[in-house]
Amino acid sequence: MSHHWGYSKSNGPENWHKEFPIANGDRQSPVDIDTGTAQHDPSLQPLLICYDKVASKSIVNNGHSFNVEFDDSQDFAVLKEGPLSGSYRLIQFHFHWGSSDGQGSEHTVNKKKYAAELHLVHWNTKYGDFGKAVQHPDGLAVLGIFLKIGPASQGLQKITEALHSIKTKGKRAAFANFDPCSLLPGNLDYWTYPGSLTTPPLLECVTWIVLKEPITVSSEQMSHFRKLNFNSEGEAEELMVDNWRPAQPLKNRKIKASFK
C-alpha cells in the first residue's frame, strides 16, 4: 500500500524499489542537470502558460507534502507549447524542501541543491482525466521551479500564512483565488527531459520542464514549511522536512535546453 512509503531511513527513497520496482526504471526523476552536456535544441518553442481563468480550491496536507488543488474540470489553467504537443491542465502544485536552507530541491544543477522546489502538475487533456493520463508516457507535464534563499516572495506569503491550518496529515482548508502566476520567475527559459513522478508510484509519465531561473524565498518563509507534520493529529510529531528524492541515473536520456 502506498501509505507505507515516506522519507525516513526505513521507508524512504532507498527502499521504494521494494514495493515499486519501477524505482530502478529507465526514466526516473529527479535527475542532476549537467549544464555542460544539456544541449540547446532550437526547435523547442517558448512555453505558453495560460493561467488567466485559474481556479484554486483547497490546500491539503497529504502526509508527504501539501498540495494546492485546482478545478481541472475545464481549461481554466493550461500549459502548452515548449516541448509539448497538445494542451495540459493544471491539477495541483506542491513543494519539496529540506531540513535546512542548503538542501531540499529534487532536481539539482551541476550537483547544486536549492532550498526547495515547486512542482506544478498538469495532465494531457487528450486522456480525459488525471488517472488515465498517468498511464501514458506523455500523460503529464510538470513545471519545476527552484526556490533559492533571498527576499521574501509575495506569491509564497499567502501560502505560508495558510500552513498553520493544515499542520497534520489529512487536514484540508479552503484556498480560493490563488494565482499561480505569482510563483513564476521573470524568465521562462527551461531544460526538458522525459521522466517520472518523484513519489510512489513513480510512474514514467512525465515530460519534465525545469526552469533555469529560480524564484526567491526568505529563510523565515521556509521555516513555516518545516513546521508542518508528516503525522496525523494525535500521533507522535514528525516534522515534515527533507521530503525530496535524490537525483536518479540519467541512463540513455538527453536533457535539452530551450536557450543557448
UniProtKB/Swiss-Prot annotation:
Residue numbers bearing the N-acetylserine modification: S2
Active-site residue list: H64
Superkingdom to which the source organism belongs: Eukaryota
Cofactor(s) this protein requires: Zn(2+)
Name of one Pfam family that matches: Carb_anhydrase
Catalysed reaction, written as an equation: hydrogencarbonate + H(+) = CO2 + H2O; urea = cyanamide + H2O
Keywords on record: Acetylation, Cell membrane, Cytoplasm, Lyase, Membrane, Metal-binding, Phosphoprotein, Zinc
Assembly with partners or alone: Interacts with SLC4A4 and SLC26A6. Interaction with SLC4A7 regulates SLC4A7 transporter activity.
Protein name: Carbonic anhydrase 2
Organism per entry: Rattus norvegicus
Gene field: Ca2
